[in-house]
Amino acid sequence: MIKSLLALTHQGGDTTRIVAEIQDPDNLEAAKLVGNGRTTLLDIRETVAKLVVQTSRQSGAAAVYTELFDYEGDEFYFYEDHGLAGSTYAEAQLAFDAVSVVGFIDGSVTKLNPPPSTVLTAEHTLVVIVEDDSALSGQSRSRTEPALNRLGEQLGSDEHPTQALLIGWNDRAPIVVRELDRYAPPGSTLTIVTTYGEPELPPLTNLAVTVEKAQTTSRAVLDKHVVAALDQIIVLCYDRDLDTQTADSRTLVTLLHVRDILGKVGSDVPVVSEMIDDRNRVLASVADVDDVVVSGEIVSLVVTQLSEDGRLEAVFKEILGAEGSEVYLRPAEWYVQPGDDITWATVVAGASRRNETAIGLKSPLLAREGQRFGVVVNPPKSEVYTISPGDAVVVFAED
């Protein structure tokens, strides 16, 4: 890869932007030197590991990230001629019917989910979520006023010590453990069960970790560890120790057992898994897995987006990291009072009141209407919903 970068940059006159995947993090600094400011470098291990952790924390998150990373639905774009100079960020969130304003670029600094009172200027470039950048041309202003008398609990919180189970071990696992620790409240626990590898743990602050070497396709082993009290389950593939199809086959067997056990104990804890071969993702759906992260597929989506616009690098870094604002799916009653005829503009206003940015909704009703995992991203402000207990609002929030 280093030689390829040298070949692309040695003449110096070309300003074409380059996006490169880094397999070995030891090559990162050298690649930065060769790239000479023209190259966006994507650390594959970091990207996949962080996405695994983000999606394991809440069911439906993978559907949100997939929507934001690919080109089939609504994704990130940048809006320069927005006409909102002098408006606050809270007002900007409600300004357009079919566009979700989620932040702005101020000079070289990207800010997602800024304080609602932040005043925009003509020099600010908006970060938005929209179906296509062509939809920004002549975008109509929203005429839907939020129903402020329908707002919900402003101070809702669900932070508590968590119990996580990590099945399997590979080169990305130490990063997964590190990221789990960053999100875990003090007093949380993590159990690692693996057939291969000798887990070496990073320095941890919040997690108490136990490690067991055992056969992860064994029903007896899984019966011992897959319990109703778990908050999240992650299954990693053995791509370091086995060939692709054998590793995926073992992952699928593990997933089948895990789902069967969870069904018997009456738990709906999210199960997130890696799958090396994208073709095996269809088979994984038979196991009723909430969110399957396919390493190669997600990296390809991110690389494609970055090649289109280098400004996305800062956006992706923030939403995949533990610092700044990232994706959360939180109880809808925190934002609006459950009931009929709730406009999306009202939900957006409820999120703004909590210093959060609403970008979507998760509901069983949406699942019955064909939305993947019951999740819709960037609904029109004028869209009307029936909000029920168990529904969740997708937001950008700092914690």
What are these regions (language model features)?
Residues 1-399:
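Cytosolic regulatory regions of ion transport systems
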